[in-house]
């Protein structure tokens, strides 16, 4: 399947997350993004070095600037279970705006055409690193990394595009 691209409609899918009352919920991507301008970014895995030290902190630190430029929500998706994503979210006590969403079976990542086979490293099927900007479900920016690179999918690149 071809990767999601500018002009595409974000596919719908169910993702897991813990709400403000610490209850596990299944949420629809369309329910989160319809009628809004959202950043949807994906990482290969929770607690991995580049994801934890650069990619996620970049969006947390730039969240206010993104919101000032019209972004309604910042959504992080990873092929991990909701409990791992909850623990990862708690490792960023300064986070006020990034929602940590779990794609436990990788079905949403596959619908985006962004799966990455890391079986040789013992990680199974994961997500390519990416950052999408979508306005009312239409993809307006699609910054998709090759391999393990981190060059175009950070918050700074999304800010430049706004």
Curated annotation (Swiss-Prot):
**GO MF annotations, alphabetized:** thioredoxin peroxidase activity
Note the InterPro entries from the entry: PRX5-like, Redoxin, Thioredoxin-like_sf, Thioredoxin_domain
Highest taxon, organism lineage = Eukaryota
Domain Thioredoxin: residue ranges: 4-162
**Protein's UniProt keywords contain Disulfide bond:** no
Single GO cellular component term: cytoplasm
Q: Which residues cross the membrane?
A: none
**Active site per database record:** 51 (cysteine sulfenic acid (-soh) intermediate)
Matching PANTHER family, A to Z?
PEROXIREDOXIN (PTHR10430), PEROXIREDOXIN-2A-RELATED (PTHR10430:SF8)
SUBUNIT field: Monomer.
Give the similarity note. Answer: Belongs to the peroxiredoxin family. Prx5 subfamily.
Which protein, by its recorded name, is this? Peroxiredoxin-2C
Query: Which species is this record about?
Result: Oryza sativa subsp. japonica (Rice)
């Amino acid at each position: 399947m071809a990767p999601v691209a500018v002009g595409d409609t974000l596919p719908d899918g169910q993702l897991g997350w813990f709400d403000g009352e610490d209850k596990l919920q299944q949420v629809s991507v369309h329910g989160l993004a319809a009628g809004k301008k959202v950043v949807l970014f994906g990482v290969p895995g929770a607690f991995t070095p580049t994801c934890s030290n650069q990619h996620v902190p970049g969006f947390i630190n730039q969240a206010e600037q993104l919101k000032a430029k019209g972004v309604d929500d910042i959504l992080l998706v990873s092929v991990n279970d909701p409990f791992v994503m909850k623990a990862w979210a708690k490792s960023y006590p300064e986070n006020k705006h990034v929602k940590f969403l779990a794609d436990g079976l990788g079905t949403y990542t596959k619908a985006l055409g962004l799966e990455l086979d890391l079986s040789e490293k013992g990680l199974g099927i994961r997500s390519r690193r990416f950052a999408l900007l979508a306005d009312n479900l239409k993809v307006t920016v699609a910054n998709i990394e090759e391999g393990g690179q981190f060059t175009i999918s950070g918050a700074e690149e999304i800010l430049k595009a706004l």
